[in-house]
Amino acid sequence: MAVKLIYLFLFLYIALLISGRTMSTTAGRRDGKSGRTEWLYVAGECAKLPRCNKYCVSNGFHLGGFCEKLSPQASYLSCVCKYT
């Protein structure tokens, strides 16, 4: 029984790591070889968060945030917070 629980928690941990709400980009020079990884967190729709940057900073994302369309087919802008 304990082994099954360990596998369940491992599966949930991996699922959280590869969830669709986080994306990774490389920050730095144009060729992307600075070595620093910048993570993006989708906080919600910008219509619901009109001060996206202030929202991100006040919630611990010290690099701030911005509004962006996540795909060409998206009909709304999403608030994206940055962190390392």
UniProtKB/Swiss-Prot annotation:
GO terms for biological process: defense response to fungus; killing of cells of another organism. It is found in: Secreted. Keywords: Antimicrobial, Disulfide bond, Fungicide, Plant defense, Secreted, Signal. It comes from the Eukaryota. InterPro entries: Scorpion_toxin-like_sf. Disulfide bonds join 46-67, 52-79, 56-81. The keyword Acyltransferase does not apply. One of its GO terms (cellular component) is extracellular region. Residues 1-24 form the signal peptide. Belongs to the DEFL family. This is Defensin-like protein 37. The gene is EDA21.
